[in-house]
Design a protein with these regions (language model features):
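Short glycine/proline-enriched coil/turn segments at helix->beta-strand junctions
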Residues: 38-42, 94-99, 117-119
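Short, flexible, basic/aromatic active-site loop/helix in glycosyltransferases
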Residues: 140-153
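Short catalytic/ligand-binding loop motif for oxyanion handling, primarily in non-cytosolic enzymes
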Residues: 52-56, 108-111, 130-132, 171-173, ...
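Catalytic core and acceptor-binding pocket of nucleotide-sugar-dependent glycosyltransferases
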Residues: 152-241
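The conserved acidic donor/metal-binding loop of glycosyltransferases
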Residues: 103-107
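Conserved donor-nucleotide/metal-binding helix-loop-beta segment in metal-dependent transferases, i.e.
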Residues: 108-143
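A conserved donor-nucleotide-binding helix/loop in the catalytic core
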Residues: 24-26, 31-32, 73-102
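N-terminal anchoring/stem segment of glycosyltransferases
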Residues: 1-76, 236-245, 250-279
Length: 279
């Protein structure tokens, strides 16, 4: 199964003026890509020209089977400060199915039984917390935009840090509705609008087509023993930015794991300026 990493650099550039990645994000990106290739198949990075430049300068392009720059084509109407994860949606548009769509801070440690995952499988679903997943009246849309009346707002959202999608019709409906929503949002915050497009529309579109969604795990199980199969560092990032000791320990552990499992990449790691303090 081919996996897709994505990196749209526009959100960070708009926020900070330049593109950069934290040291721990560089390391999880490397570990995520290499572990997928070891256990589950090919993986590509869908990025933009700035992302390609960044990875080239650090000698990282070889961790993927391919690096493409289709995200240069994201239209200007998509606001990167609101839709900061739009690149992941567009990466599926440009890649098609079947595909495993995976965040760069998500690691799959072992071989997956893809035949058991059905037409669409997500890592876990989520409760409908009103401050994260508000109802339809919350959204301020451009004149003429109408939500599809078949969308079921009672469905639990899907966490899309990792999902496997085989059904072409579903991929086209989901990405089409997500892009239509993002293009027609009249402003909006960077949480509720983004997670609606990315995480709420997927189960809604699955239900519209009568496709059962397979939920791989749940938060309780992932917190209890998830590292046997999956690691997602999203929840640790703020802590690592605030705690230099925790950050250094995490980075050194990642480096040890990469050099133990993939010793041919040690010289690449040593050449990445952001990682030099850990050698």
């Amino acid at each position: 199964m081919e996996a897709i990493h994505s990196n749209w650099t526009a959100p960070r550039i708009k926020a900070d003026g330049i593109y950069y990645a934290d040291d721990f994000d560089i390391l999880t990106t490397i570990l995520s890509a290499l572990k997928w290739r070891e256990k589950n198949g090919q993986i590509k990075m869908v990025t933009d020209s700035e992302g390609l430049r960044y990875y080239n300068e650090r000698g990282m392009c070889g961790i993927w089977d391919a690096v493409t720059t289709e995200l240069d084509n994201i239209p200007d109407v998509i606001d990167p400060s609101v839709f900061w994860a739009a690149g992941k949606i567009y990466s599926l548009v440009y890649s098609g199915t079947p595909a495993a769509v995976m965040d760069t801070d998500f690691i799959v440690w072992d071989k997956l039984a893809f035949d058991n995952l059905g037409e669409i499988a997500v890592i876990h679903d989520e409760d409908i917390y009103p401050d994260v997943y508000p109802d339809i009246s919350h959204f301020n849309m451009k004149r003429g935009y109408v939500f599809d009346p078949e969308l079921d707002w009672r469905l639990r959202p899907s966490n899309t840090a990792f999902y496997v999608i085989r059904n072409k019709e579903l991929a086209e409906l989901y990405t089409g509705e997500a892009v239509r929503f993002m293009e027609n949002a009249a402003g909006g915050d960077s949480l509720t609008y983004m997670v609606f497009a990315e995480q709420r529309l997927l189960p809604m579109c699955s239900a519209m087509l009568g496709i059962d969604m397979y939920v791989i795990s749940n938060l309780e199980r992932l917190f209890r023993d998830g590292e046997r199969w999956f690691t997602h560092t999203w929840g640790m990032k703020r802590q690592m930015r605030e705690n230099t000791a925790l950050r250094a320990d995490f980075c050194r552990r990642c480096i040890r794991r990469i050099t133990a499992d993939f010793p041919e990449y040690e010289s690449m790691l040593r050449g990445i300026e952001e990682l030099r303090p850990y050698f």
